[in-house]
Each structure stands twice: as structure tokens, then as C-alpha cells.
Amino acid sequence: MMATTEQHPTLERATFKHSVNILIVVAPYYKDIAEQLVEGAKAEIEASGATWEVTDVPGALEVPTAIAIAHCHTNFDGYVALGCVIRGETTHYDTVCNDSSRALQLLGLQGVCLGNGILTVENSSQAEARADVDGQNKGGGAAAAALHLIKLKQKWSKPTGKIGFLSQVENKLV
């Protein structure tokens, strides 16, 4: 089955007043695909004025674990998960796709700003179409998602202007 070229609406590119640093975590099992995904992610991050660092992990199942470790022990503002899983002859494909996606979603629900660019496809042609920087550019899309979540987190994390003492009467910040 061919990948469609249908266009979807996109949000305006996120930009930042202060420095933003992104960790790109990539499973380079399919090296050519991974390189395209990383290229797209780097370009989007740089276009937003942010900086990036790349780290490799053995496979798609290790991507969420690496992000969780980095989130606990570093000061990255957000994360981009990249990799590719192509269906094979066994059910391993389903396990890797479902578990990596679920783990990334759980991280997001805990407030980790991340974009999921782990491709889950039937064949290499689909992967190439989605990874191509001049095509569907899913690496760039995953980076854009992470950047938008960082922007949203910054918006909702603004100081209220109050000094932080609790009123004993109302039990509210004053």
C-alpha cells in the first residue's frame, strides 16, 4: 500500500524567548531511515531556535527508558523519540509497536514533553516515505510536537506574581 501525500493542517512553529534544549533519542536499527528522521528533527529544532543532542539506543523498546532516565537525571526541556519498526513474520512487531508507544504516552501523561516519531510500518517503502525530510518528514513532526508541548508547559508554568505564603484563613496563596 502506498503512503498518501494528503496534507494536514499544522500549527505555527513554536519559538522561545529563553534557551530550550532537546534530547533526540533514536533507535538506529534501520540506519538510513533513522538518519532521515534525525535530520528532520534537527532542522525543526534549529528552526525554532532551540538546541539538540542525539543519543542512540539499541531498539525502539529502549527509547522510552532512555527518555525516562534522561528526564530524571538531566535538564533537557523535551525529548524526541525516533526509530522505525517494520512488520516481520512474527508477533514481535506488535509487542514493540504497542509497548514503545504506550510507554511514551505514559511519560507524556506524567508531564514529560515529547514527540513520538517511532515509525510503525508494514514495509520499507512506507518507512522511507514517512522519514523523507522532503516528504512526510515525521522526524520534523515529532520535534514540532515536543516543541509545542514545551511551549504549552512554559505558558502554564508562569509565576502568578504571588510570593508563595499560604493564608491560614483561606488556605490559598497570597
Segments from the language model and where they lie:
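SAM-dependent methyltransferases
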Residues: 1-21, 158-174
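Glycine-rich phosphate/diphosphate-binding loop of Rossmann-like nucleotide-binding domains
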Residues: 11-57
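Short, ordered loop/turn segments at secondary-structure junctions
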Residues: 28-29, 57-60, 84-85, 118-124
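Generic secondary-structure signature for well-ordered alpha-helical cores
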Residues: 31, 46-50, 68-72, 105, ...
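N-terminal small/polar loop signature for handling phosphorylated ligands or for N-terminal nucleophile
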Residues: 55-81, 87-91, 95, 105-110
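Short, acidic/small-residue loops that bind anionic groups at enzyme active sites
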Residues: 94-121, 125
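Phosphate-binding/catalytic loops
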Residues: 122-136, 167
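A charged, well-structured terminal subsegment
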Residues: 136-169
